[in-house]
Swiss-Prot record:
GO terms for biological process: brain development; camera-type eye development; cilium assembly; cilium organization; cranial skeletal system development; fucose metabolic process; gene expression; limb development. The lineage of its organism: Eukaryota, Metazoa, Chordata, Craniata, Vertebrata. It is found in: Endoplasmic reticulum membrane. The chain crosses the membrane at residues 2-22. This is Beta-1,3-glucosyltransferase. The gene is B3glct. Pathway: Protein modification; protein glycosylation. Disulfide bonds: none annotated.
Length: 489
């Protein structure tokens, strides 16, 4: 049975390009935003909400965020002359870790605490009904500490959350960013004070929404997430003030298979059990694919790069792949994808996704993690879900002096450090996954059209591929019906 997001692809993909039309709110100018006489309602103005769009600097994502900003302000202008502030996250600070939000809370506290009641966060594809949002926030006393959102929870303990709450993982709730989430100013002030007195302790940022919820909860010293039923990802209830439709971006014609080179990292001990899974599932979708190993086996065939296998890291092997691609492949091959031999990926969906990016730009794309972002550090694309490079990104990397400090260094982290030093940002896509489908909440995956998953551990990888990633009629319908979202920007 197909996941809900796949079943909705035909209708939702078309909706992706029509966001500005669908978001329009039917309101009358006579609606009074300054009065709230109902019992239990709190008198706040629209101008007391600071909107923060969790945007990215890549041109495609920045334009989508700018479009949402214009829509929010347009809705607001229909209601009041005192417009709210709408901020784009990637413009707020030059620091690498701005996307993790917590380092920005002291700035929010100093800048907005006197004249604001709420900081409302959302993603670039979140759709907002501004009058209803204001009405919803008026239910909560802005003088108290509130952490509001659509609640997600783990059905079983998972590695991406360090097996937190292993006895009963369902007890801890964290927000689905796609539905929007909000912090009251008193809570922002409290968190800002704490951040000034004690540094962020975690070295790694893996799942930001879970980690923010943990930090706010503070082992019971702070508020837990308050679920808000009006914060939605699917438009299933007339009360919804936010929605987030499933989408697989398509900006014109999908990238040709011949423009994508796929490099599979493997080693001799996995030739017999992992490579057959690759060939049985997604390999046929790739026009250009090679298997890079520590041992040349003609039956597969594998390519021996002359780099000894290591139990961890694989940095030497990855840089050898990058150099081989840049120096020995045709210039018309615009994209390199590096995956593990236990990565499950949809090349057809990747072709759709890459149509939204300019291969002449330095693009480094995948699921974004962070290391040491509270104290400098850098972002990186986690390798298991697949790392996507434009040719230009690889060229800039290899003309620099940044290289592995050892063959067994963690390749994805070294790449992140190198690209950070070069000023090439990681472009995040939540459609890539470092873990298995069972490691994510069902509600979270329900509004995705996934591109990849990772690991064969305790699953049937062929079944997972057929359920979540195999080409389908819905994917073909996307090509036939979806408009180029860039046309409206």
């Amino acid at each position: 049975m197909r996941p809900p997001a796949l079943l909705a692809l035909f209708s939702c993909s078309a909706a992706f390009a029509l966001m500005s039309e669908e978001i329009k709110e039917k309101v009358t100018p006579s609606q009074d935003l300054r009065q709230s006489s109902l019992p239990g309602r709190h008198d706040i103005d629209l101008k007391e909400i600071v909107f923060v769009i969790q945007s990215q600097s890549n041109s495609f994502h920045a334009k989508r965020a700018e479009q949402l900003k214009k829509n929010i302000l347009k809705q607001a202008a229909n209601l009041t002359q005192d417009l709210p502030r709408v901020l784009l996250l990637h413009q707020l600070a030059k620091q690498e870790g701005a996307w993790t939000i917590l380092p920005l809370l002291p700035h929010f506290s100093v800048t907005y605490s006197k004249n604001s009641a709420w900081i409302f966060f959302c993603e670039e594809e979140t759709r907002l009904q501004i009058p209803r949002l204001l009405d919803t926030l008026r239910r909560y006393d802005p003088s108290k500490e509130w952490f509001l959102g659509k609640a997600l929870y783990d059905e079983e303990s998972t590695i991406i959350h360090h097996y937190a709450f292993s006895e009963n993982p369902t007890v801890f709730k964290y927000p689905d960013f796609a539905a929007g989430w909000a912090l009251s100013i008193p809570l922002v002030n409290k968190l800002a004070k704490r951040l000034k007195s004690e540094a962020l302790k975690s070295d790694f940022t893996i799942d930001l929404k879970h980690e923010i919820a943990l930090y706010i909860w503070d082992k019971g010293g702070g508020p837990a997430l308050t679920p808000v039923p009006e914060f939605c990802t699917e438009d299933v209830d007339p009360r919804c003030v936010t929605t987030f439709h499933s989408f697989l971006p398509l900006c014109g014609v999908p990238v040709k298979k011949e423009e994508i080179f796929v490099a599979v990292k493997t080693c001799k001990k996995f030739h017999a059990d992992r490579i057959p899974i690759v060939k049985k599932t997604w390999a046929a979708q790739a026009s250009l694919i090679e298997y890079y190993s520590d041992y040349a086996e003609t039956a597969i065939p594998t390519v021996d790069l002359g780099i000894p296998n290591t139990d961890r890291g694989h940095c030497g092997k990855t840089f050898a792949i990058l150099e081989k691609f840049l120096n020995h492949s045709h210039n018309k091959i615009s994209w390199l994808v590096i995956v593990d031999d236990d990565t499950l990926i949809s090349i057809s969906r990747l072709r759709h996704l890459l149509s939204c990016y300019d291969s002449s730009d330095p693009v480094f794309l995948g699921e974004r993690y962070g290391y040491g972002l509270g104290t400098g550090g850098y972002s990186y694309v986690t390798g298991g879900g697949g790392m996507v490079f434009s040719r230009e990104a690889i060229r800039r990397l290899l003309v620099s002096s940044c290289r592995c400090y050892s063959n067994d260094a963690p390749d994805d982290m070294v790449l992140g450090m190198c690209f950070s030093g070069l000023g090439v940002p990681v472009t995040h896509s939540p459609l890539f996954h470092q873990a298995r489908p069972v490691d994510y909440p069902k509600d979270y995956l329900a509004h995705q059209i996934p591109v990849s998953f990772h690991k064969h551990w305790h699953i049937d990888p062929v079944k997972v591929y057929l359920t979540w990633l195999a080409p389908s009629e819905e994917d073909q319908a996307t090509q036939e019906t979806q408009k180029d979202p860039r046309e409206e920007l």
